[in-house]
Amino acid sequence: PAKIVGKSNPFKSTLKANEIKLLTECVNEANMFTTTVSTKILTDFFNCKLDGVLKVNNTRLLAYLMMQLSCYNYIVYEWQSVIENNKLILKKIKGEPLTRTDLSSATDQAKNIYPKGYEIIDKYIKQLQKG
């Protein structure tokens, strides 16, 4: 296979270091994952270069965050496929990688009934937009 050079960016993330730092505070405050994440872990997540995987506590809350980031063009609209294709996140119960279908269902649910903790995400998204 041909060696591809340059930086791959499947999420097409426009997030800067200070914005990722803010998002790190957000996901930790919202207890999004089963572990506390560092700025480096979140940076690696958005670069699809995680040394391991994250395990989600609440898939709907994750979907809500990613949906918001996508709405404001911080990441691509196809974020669900990026998570599935790169096997970045495991389901809490079965410990299997989240699929696009799981994320699509969670996104639909989050649009109808805001998930517990959504106000934490809204607060940080507002801060992101202020710069």
List PLM regions with ranges.
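Flexible coil/loop and intrinsically disordered linker positions at secondary-structure junctions
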Residues: 1-131
